Regions:
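Structured soluble/peripheral alpha/beta segments that form catalytic or ligand/cofactor-binding pockets
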Residues: 1-330
């Protein structure tokens, strides 16, 4: 399990490698997500690392989000595997990830966060590759506690490990993961879509979507990543994603809706691209989703699922003005 989540940062062309872990307590619906990202610019040996932690709940105070950043002057200082990472920054923040023991601390100017978690997974990771990058995912459970800005959550969290990487940051993107699709612990879905333009007709035609669906002991790889606008259109905005994914034998239709941001807890995370641009990622752990599985060429669904708590991250390319810090209004 350790060797599967290896660093994938391109050395010559530059790019990004994003490793994300999230979990939801099925009893209280409290959730956390922990993001670790490495960026490098073309033909530069230096790399920038970002560590972000968030706690959220479906009602009451929506969320806490903290971030720390540091720079590495050479690639040899980066870990070979995400699951064996050691992170230390001048601010005093640190992270230790080894032997499925995950612990760390973030210091910022106004607050701090600490966490101690133990991870376990009954299945091996699955990967999908395309010419400019790839996606890797693994259903995982965490047992432990997290504390941020005086807010504490603890228990057994059910979620996913996700890694995605590439040479060029997409203008539009959606990342979706459901650890218990339809409330069934034997069904998990992780999917990703990338758009070549802002929301609109051009973006809908120039999009590619991939995903991994586990149903019991059977795994479906929807790996037809090339733009498929002639077969089925996709829709992406700040809070919703609709797409059709294809494999050689099946297709998957999904509609993910994060709802009204005034009601559903959303977070806005100011992110950076390898090219030095700034963008806004919107994240919620409480999106609703409707999924249907078809045989290729058939209009009769083989199976159908609905879920009220899915992890959804969107990048809609509509953020002309962003604050200086990591947190923004979603």
């Amino acid at each position: 399990m350790k060797t599967a989540f290896r660093q994938q940062l391109p050395r010559l062309t530059g790019g990004y490698d994003h490793y994300l872990e999230f979990g939801v307590d099925t009893r209280t619906q409290q959730a956390f997500w922990l993001s670790r990202q490495v960026l490098s610019r073309p033909w530069h040996d230096a790399a920038q690392r970002r560590l972000t932690v968030s706690l959220c709940q479906p009602s009451g105070p929506s969320a806490v989000l903290l971030q720390d950043t540091d720079a590495r002057s050479a690639y040899p200082s980066l870990p070979m595997c995400w699951t064996e990472e050691q992170y230390n920054s001048p601010s005093g923040s640190f992270l230790s990830s080894e032997d499925d023991q995950l612990q760390g601390r973030i210091f910022t100017a106004s607050s701090m966060a600490t966490w101690r978690l133990r991870a376990s997974s009954p299945v091996e990771p699955e990967s999908i590759l395309w010419p400019s990058g790839g996606l890797r995912c693994q259903p995982t459970q965490w047992l432990g506690e997290l504390d941020a800005s005086g807010h504490s959550i603890s228990g057994l969290f059910v979620g996913t490990r996700i890694q995605f990487w590439g040479r060029i940051a997409p203008i539009g993107m959606a990342l979706l993961s459901v650890p218990r699709l339809g409330g069934d612990a034997q069904v998990q879905l992780t999917a990703m879509g990338q758009f070549a333009g802002r929301a609109g007709a051009l973006s809908e035609r120039l999009n590619g979507s991939v995903g991994v669906l586990r149903v019991g002991h059977e795994t479906y790889h929807f790996d037809r990543w090339w733009p498929a606008g002639a077969l089925a259109s996709a829709r992406l905005d700040a809070y919703r994603w609709m797409a059709t994914l294809f494999s050689a034998t099946h297709r998957l239709e999904l509609v993910a809706d994060g709802g009204n941001p005034r009601i559903t807890p959303w977070q806005g995370l100011v992110d950076h691209t390898p090219e030095g641009l700034r963008q806004l990622l919107r994240v919620t752990a409480y999106a609703t989703i409707h999924v249907r599985l078809f045989a290729r060429g058939s209009d009769a669904p083989l199976q159908e699922w609905r879920n009220e708590s899915a992890f959804l991250m969107t990048l809609a390319g509509d953020t002309p003005n962003l604050p200086l810090g990591p947190v923004a209004t979603p």
